[in-house]
Amino acid sequence: MGEEDTATVDQNSFGGGKDSLLRNRHSSPLPSPTQLSSKVITLPTVLTLGRVAAVPILVATFYVDCWWGRTATTSIFIAAAITDWLDGYIARKMRLGSEFGAFLDPVADKLMVAATLILLCTKPMVAVVLGPVPWLVTVPSIAIIGREITMSAVREWAASQNGKLSEAVAVNSLGKWKTATQMIALTILLASRDSSFERLLPSGIGLLYVSAGLSIWSLVVYMRKIWRVLLKK
């Protein structure tokens, strides 16, 4: 899922605005570039709120059984994936990261991805050889959503402990690959509901299983790191 593996880091690394720097330049030291702004509404946050607002629209269009409904659903998901990257890019380049944005970004990603997975589970995919297979998307969906719930709990617990544990659950490359394959897989699966793209279904299913495998693998890696830290206490 669009997760904290990618999104939180993007929103986590920026200081206050230019005006505050000019006001305080003669009276106090400049803030660290790694300090988060306390502003609630910034451009990246607006984009993130847009992703949250798009979730019910995605659900509504998914059940519109005509070409424009399928097109709208796929387009909404693609737009969400693009803004997931864009809000982090803007936050880095324009130094608009905020505490609220750092909290909201992974929440928006999880909502969009989980909603899409659940929607796909409600309409069984039709495999060329096996016909309708109810569990084809359900199995990797359980793995992906279960992993995200587990990691959210683990990260919250680690944040309340010492710095070593927080470092143990920091972003790794597996999480980034998992997110990339997940977004591509879900885009393909949504698009393949249209007869023009149904030949892409096997590749979408395959990528979803790859994403589920990477999800479990990255969870194991995180748990091993945490275990090593706990053993050193």
UniProtKB/Swiss-Prot annotation:
Disruption phenotype: Normal phenotype under normal growth conditions, except slightly decreased sulfoquinovosyldiacylglycerol (SQDG) and phosphatidylglycerol (PG) content, but slightly increased phosphatidylinositol (PI) levels. The pgp1 pgp2 double mutants have delayed embryonic development and produce sterile seeds, their plastids lack thylakoid membranes and their mitochondria show abnormal membrane structures; these phenotypes are associated with deficient phosphatidylglycerol (PG) biosynthesis. Gene3D superfamilies: 1.20.120.1760. Keywords: Endoplasmic reticulum, Lipid biosynthesis, Lipid metabolism, Membrane, Microsome, Phospholipid biosynthesis, Phospholipid metabolism, Transferase, Transmembrane, Transmembrane helix. One of its GO terms (biological process) is regulation of embryonic development. Its EC number is 2.7.8.5. The chain crosses the membrane at residues 40-60, 71-91, 100-120, 125-145, 201-221. It is found in: Microsome membrane; Endoplasmic reticulum membrane. It catalyses: a CDP-1,2-diacyl-sn-glycerol + sn-glycerol 3-phosphate = a 1,2-diacyl-sn-glycero-3-phospho-(1'-sn-glycero-3'-phosphate) + CMP + H(+). Its cofactor is Mn(2+). GO terms for molecular function: CDP-diacylglycerol-glycerol-3-phosphate 3-phosphatidyltransferase activity; manganese ion binding. GO terms for cellular component: chloroplast envelope; endoplasmic reticulum membrane; intracellular membrane-bounded organelle. It is a multi-pass membrane protein. It comes from the Eukaryota. It is an enzyme of class 2 (transferase). Residues 1-23 are annotated as: Disordered. Optimum pH is 8.5. InterPro entries: CDP-alcohol_PTase-I, CDP-OH_P_trans, CDP-OH_PTrfase_TM_dom, CDP_ALCOHOL_P_TRANSF_CS, Phosphatidylglycerol_P_synth. It holds the Pfam family CDP-OH_P_transf. Pathway: Phospholipid metabolism; phosphatidylglycerol biosynthesis; phosphatidylglycerol from CDP-diacylglycerol: step 1/2. Catalyzes the committed step to the synthesis of the acidic phospholipids, including phosphatidylglycerol (PG). Together with PGPS1, required for the proper embryo development by providing PG accurate levels. PANTHER family: CDP-DIACYLGLYCEROL--GLYCEROL-3-PHOSPHATE 3-PHOSPHATIDYLTRANSFERASE 2, CDP-DIACYLGLYCEROL--GLYCEROL-3-PHOSPHATE 3-PHOSPHATIDYLTRANSFERASE-RELATED. Belongs to the CDP-alcohol phosphatidyltransferase class-I family. This is CDP-diacylglycerol--glycerol-3-phosphate 3-phosphatidyltransferase 2. The gene is PGPS2.
